[in-house]
A protein has these predicted regions:
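Catalytic PLP-binding core of fold-type I/II PLP enzymes
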Residues: 1-24, 58-61
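Proline-centered loop/turn at the N-terminus of a beta-strand
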Residues: 6, 18, 35-36, 191
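Generic detector of well-ordered alpha-helical packing
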Residues: 10-14, 36, 52, 112
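PLP-dependent aminotransferase class I/II
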Residues: 18, 22, 58-249
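Glycine-rich phosphate-binding loop of ATP-grasp-fold ATP-dependent ligases
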Residues: 49-55
Length: 249
C-alpha cells in the first residue's frame, strides 16, 4: 500500500477471526491492513449459505464499483447518470431510469441464500469457539504422535477462525504414503483431505517455473493432511479420529 498498490485480503477461511499486531485487535474483514477483504460462504465454510460470498471495504469508491459490478454494471443513482437527456424529464429524474455504464456480472445472491447466511452469522462466535475447543482436544491427543505428526496449532496475535485443522505428517518416517493413509482412515469412517495443491502445479497456472522456485509451498504440500473439524463434532468424534490415525500409522 505504501507503493500505491491495492491490497486484497483473502479471508475466505478466516471469518470470525481477529488480528492483533500489538497496536490493537481488529476483526478479520475490518480491512485494517488491506483495501478489501473477500469471504466465502460455500457449504463447507464456517458461515454457509449454499453458495456465495461477500467483500468488505472501507473505501467508498471501491464499494460503489463493486455494487455496480455485482449487478450487470447497473447504476441507479441520478448523480452518476451519463445520458442526462434520457434520465430526466422537465428537470426531474424519470423514476424508471437506470444506466449500464460498464460491463458487470450477475453476482447477486438470492434472498433465500442471504436469509440462510444471516442466520448462520448469528451463530458465528459460538461456532468459532466450539471449533477452538475441538482443536485443543486434537492438540492434546496428537501430542504423543510427534514427531511423525505435527499439527498446525495455536498461533499468537489474535483469534484463529479454525476453518480447517491441518496436520503435517512425515509419511516417509511413518512408512505409509498419504494416499494409503487416507484410504485407511476412510475404512474407519474418517474423512480426510489435502488443502491445497499448490497453484503452480495446476496446468492453468504453469509458466515453466521449476518446483524448486516454490520450496515452501512444496514442503507444506508434501506433508499436509486435513483432519475433520466441524461444529457438529463431539469430543468422542475427535478421539475416534486420532485413534484411527494412530492405528493407521
Amino acid at each position: 500500500r505504501r507503493e500505491g498498490m491495492k491490497v486484497i485480503e483473502d479471508a475466505c477461511h478466516a471469518i470470525g477471526g481477529t488480528i492483533d499486531e500489538g497496536d490493537g485487535v481488529s476483526a478479520v474483514g475490518a480491512c485494517a491492513y488491506s483495501d478489501a477483504a473477500a469471504f466465502s460462504f460455500h457449504p463447507v465454510k464456517t458461515v454457509a449459505m449454499g453458495e456465495g460470498g461477500a467483500v468488505t471495504t472501507n473505501d467508498e469508491t471501491m464499494a460503489g464499483v463493486m455494487r455496480r459490478l455485482r449487478s450487470h454494471g447497473i447504476r441507479r443513482e441520478p448523480d452518476g447518470f451519463i445520458n442526462t437527456a434520457l434520465a430526466t424529464d422537465g428537470g426531474k429524474t424519470n423514476p424508471w431510469y437506470y444506466e449500464i455504464g460498464e460491463l458487470g456480472f450477475n453476482y447477486r445472491a438470492s434472498d433465500i441464500h442471504c436469509a440462510l447466511g444471516l442466520s448462520q452469522m448469528k451463530k458465528l462466535d459460538r461456532s468459532v469457539a466450539r471449533r477452538a475447543e475441538l482443536v485443543e482436544i486434537y492438540l492434546d491427543l496428537l501430542a504423543p504422535l510427534a514427531p511423525v505428526v505435527r499439527p498446525l496449532g495455536r498461533r499468537g496475535g489474535g483469534r484463529t477462525a479454525w476453518h480447517l485443522f491441518v496436520a503435517r505428517i512425515d509419511f516417509a518416517a511413518a512408512g505409509i504414503s498419504r494416499g494409503d493413509l487416507m484410504r485407511a482412515l476412510r475404512e474407519c469412517g474418517v474423512g480426510s483431505q489435502v488443502h491445497y495443491i499448490p497453484l503452480h502445479l495446476m496446468p492453468a497456472f504453469q509458466t515453466g517455473a521449476a518446483e524448486a522456485a516454490f520450496p515452501g509451498a512444496m514442503n507444506y504440500y508434501e506433508k499436509c493432511l486435513s483432519l475433520p473439524l466441524y461444529v457438529g463434532m463431539t469430543d468422542e468424534d475427535v478421539e475416534n479420529v486420532v485413534r484411527s490415525l494412530a492405528a493407521a500409522l
